[in-house]
């Protein structure tokens, strides 16, 4: 059990059997009565935001969550297949639960998988990845005056905007949270 004094950004709590992540919290004392904690929570099952107010000292549940190191193996229909690195069990995760992160997965890549009551909830990618450009149009020579970008398809199939000087075969660093180009490797 967590008390409201334990609240911090990113803490995962359970309310009425539903897991939430604390996005924002603020302690406040109204003119009358005891102190309160106003929170903004993200439902981890459906990604919806919820506002909730707790009395100071109120207890909330601790969800049965664990993070496991897994290796991405392959795509099977709409599922992504991962292997647990400690037990060697295979785990199927529906692609739509990954919130667009599946586009960054390469075969044999290691990721952390968040499990809630033994069921996969989300995958945790590194903040940045280095991927190879497989398709992009050639840049016009001398067009370096402005900050112009062009679309480029990466080895995993996602398309990002890259500067004009990036060519096919270049390895680029990409921010996995924003899909922004960070530089060449």
From Swiss-Prot:
Gene3D superfamilies: 2.30.30.30, Nucleic acid-binding proteins
Transmembrane feature ranges: none
GO BP annotations, alphabetical order: peptide biosynthetic process
Pfam families in alphabetical order: EFP, EFP_N, Elong-fact-P_C
InterPro entries membership: Elong-fact-P_C (IPR015365), NA-bd_OB-fold (IPR012340), Rib_uL2_dom2 (IPR014722), Transl_elong_fac_P/YeiP (IPR020599), Transl_elong_KOW-like (IPR013185), Transl_elong_P/YeiP_cen (IPR001059), Transl_elong_P/YeiP_CS (IPR013852), Transl_elongation_fac_P (IPR011768)
Pathway(s) served: Protein biosynthesis; polypeptide chain elongation
Keyword tRNA processing included in the entry's annotation: no
GO CC, one annotated term: cytoplasm
Function: Involved in peptide bond synthesis. Stimulates efficient translation and peptide-bond synthesis on native or reconstituted 70S ribosomes in vitro. Probably functions indirectly by altering the affinity of the ribosome for aminoacyl-tRNA, thus increasing their reactivity as acceptors for peptidyl transferase.
UniProt name for this protein: Elongation factor P
Species this protein is from: Nitratidesulfovibrio vulgaris (strain DSM 19637 / Miyazaki F)
Gene that specifies this protein: efp
């Amino acid at each position: 059990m967590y008390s409201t004094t334990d609240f911090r950004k990113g803490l995962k709590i359970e309310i009425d059997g539903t897991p939430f992540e604390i996005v924002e919290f603020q302690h406040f004392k109204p003119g009358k009565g005891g102190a309160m904690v106003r929170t903004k929570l993200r439902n981890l099952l459906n990604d919806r935001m919820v506002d909730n107010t707790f009395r100071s000292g109120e207890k909330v549940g601790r969800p049965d969550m664990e993070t496991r190191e897994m290796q991405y193996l392959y795509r099977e229909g709409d599922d992504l297949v991962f292997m647990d690195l400690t037990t060697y069990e295979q785990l199927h995760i529906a692609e739509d639960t990954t919130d667009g992160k599946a586009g960054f997965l390469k075969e044999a890549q290691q990721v952390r998988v968040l499990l809630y009551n033994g069921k996969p909830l989300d995958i945790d990618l590194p903040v940045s990845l280095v991927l190879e450009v497989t398709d992009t149009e050639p840049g016009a020579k001398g067009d370096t005056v402005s900050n112009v970008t062009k679309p480029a398809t990466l080895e995993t199939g996602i398309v990002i905007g890259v500067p004009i000087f990036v060519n096919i075969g270049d390895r680029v660093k990409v921010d996995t949270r924003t899909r922004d180009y960070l530089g060449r490797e």
